[in-house]
Amino acid sequence: MFDFQHQLKILPDKPGVYIMKNSLGEVIYVGKAKVLKNRVRQYFQNSKNHSEKVRAMVKNIAEFEYIVTDSEMEALILECNLIKKYSPRYNIALKDDKFYPFIKITTNEDFPRVYVTRNFAKDGNRYFGPYTNGTAVYEVMGLIKKLFPLRTCKKAIVEGGEPTRACLNYHINLCKAPCAGYISKAEYWKMIDEIINILNGTDTSIIKNLKLEMEKAAEELEFEKAAKIRDRILAIELISEKQKMFTVKEGDEDFIDLYTDEKDGCAQVFFVREGKVTGREHFMIENISDDPVKEVISSFIASFYGGTAQIPKTIYVPEEIEDQELIEKFLTEKRGSKVWIKVPKKGDKKNLLDMVRNNAKIMLDQFKEKMVEEKELNKSALIELADVLGLDSLPTRIEAYDISNIQGVDSVGTMVVFENGKAKNSDYRRFKIKSVKGPNDYESMREILSRRFSHGLEEVNKIKERNLEYSKGKFCIFPDLIMMDGGKGQVNIALEVLKDFGIEIPVCGLVKDDKHRTRGIIFNNEEILIRRGSGLMNLITRVQDEVHRYAITYHRSLRDKRTLHSILEDIPRIGEKRRRNLLMKFGSIDNIKKASMEELLDTPGIDKRAAESIKQYFSS
């Protein structure tokens, strides 16, 4: 039993992060504190000053933990990371929280690759972005691929290395095949330098030279060649134009405002580059009606800029935000030069901020309208489903199950959940098959259903014993309907498992046609055809697609992990991180065997003792 009185007494007089948990051990809130002792104790003092949301949270706190940090800045960074990790119920959650994509050029390689990534790291490579418009970054990448035949493989290719056979991309003119030695490092880097200059927007000589080439081709009546050069010029100009929107310069500014209704809110950001609004983003934030605007915007800024690497010099907000000095310091460290958060009182900047707020209202209204429309469509589909199956009530919560394996290897089971016709990702579960050997879908399904309902009954008993509220996101909430991604056989397995546990839940299966498309439902040993294009068929298709996607994704992740399990696991001093670094650098076990001591030491994370261990292992 957690001793609140004792734990509150021994709280340190230092900065840090506190983590609130409920009776099932779930993290429900993460907060930072300048002084942990003062901040945490506030929650358990007179609740009259607390908002409804805070009072509800305090009721659910069964225990708390804390992490002491050296500074308030460290506490802020740790808080951001923990919120992203746990997505606690009572923290402000951005509906569209994400890391923005960058274009990465692996300049620490002899023959660099150019690709899109959402992971920014100070690793010596070149990054361009972040691109707040996800579509734009892929358009830019598409144009780069069209203009420059670069390699896309992950092979460790070094100049003068042993050549390998060129892949299909070489034969269709999409790659110059440095792996086969068909292009020198110097020639390849000419293309890379051009790309860097185009993305930087710093070199106009490329277009000038191309225009001269085009004019010369036209004079010599080589119109086809001239047309190709013209298309190349247009593509480069288009890339440069798109890049302007995402290049943060000294005088650039972001404008952030918030609009809330009686329950939820929308945060809107306008990006102003060279005095023009070049882009915008909006984020829906749920259940913030009781939260002060200054707190919401403060949390939003920490979360929003925590996911990007480039920050403007000035950010305009409607009022002074909570911990403004600390947030400015956090952003300044991230940017590398001073960042200001300002409140415009009048003039153009105030007018623009008003426009941001108006747009936030419009986006929130549209979001709510779409939600209502979607809710009606989903309800209609659930009514149709209940009617078709003859259920007494709407199947508000549907659980769907699938098994995935390739020739019996890495068998996995997955459970996806739909509530009120919408996917509820937080309740998804995945199971690695333990007791079944070989490709046996029926027995694999029996195992995962048994594990699911066994866990569920244990939780239900625990909740009843402690007189607790049912918690969301665990096994204790049972479905109104189970949907099997298979026919009569899988339905019967599910019914047998439920009978063993003494649970009554209706179970249906999906019947497919010759083209493996769902044509109907099997229920009570009868096949029921569903009209194609109906709301019910759309719902069933969404459920089926989602359970397939989730199963395949999990299966692929297990397969990839298994592939990485190699002979390297037997080498002393070589852990998972070092294995990955070795495979990324050398591409294969054979190349690692042939590597010199100097090449091994040049691998990230490989010290002298690890390199000696590798050499000794392969020479023995």
From Swiss-Prot:
CDD domains: GIY-YIG_UvrC_Cho (cd10434). HAMAP family: UvrC (MF_00203). Belongs to the UvrC family. Residues 204-239 form the UVR domain. It is found in: Cytoplasm. This is UvrABC system protein C. It comes from Clostridium perfringens (strain SM101 / Type A). NCBIfam families: PRK00558.1-5, uvrC. InterPro entries: DisA/LigA_HHH, GIY-YIG_endonuc, GIY-YIG_endonuc_sf, GIY-YIG_UvrC_Cho, RuvA_2-like, UVR_dom, UVR_dom_sf, UvrABC_protein_C. One of its GO terms (biological process) is nucleotide-excision repair. One of its GO terms (molecular function) is excinuclease ABC activity. It holds the Pfam family UvrC_RNaseH. The keyword Cytoplasm applies. Gene3D superfamilies: 5' to 3' exonuclease, C-terminal subdomain, GIY-YIG endonuclease, UVR domain, UvrC, RNAse H endonuclease domain. The keyword Cell membrane does not apply. Keywords: Cytoplasm, DNA damage, DNA excision, DNA repair, Excision nuclease, SOS response. GO terms for cellular component: cytoplasm; excinuclease repair complex. Residues 13-92 form the GIY-YIG domain. The UvrABC repair system catalyzes the recognition and processing of DNA lesions. UvrC both incises the 5' and 3' sides of the lesion. The N-terminal half is responsible for the 3' incision and the C-terminal half is responsible for the 5' incision. Interacts with UvrB in an incision complex.
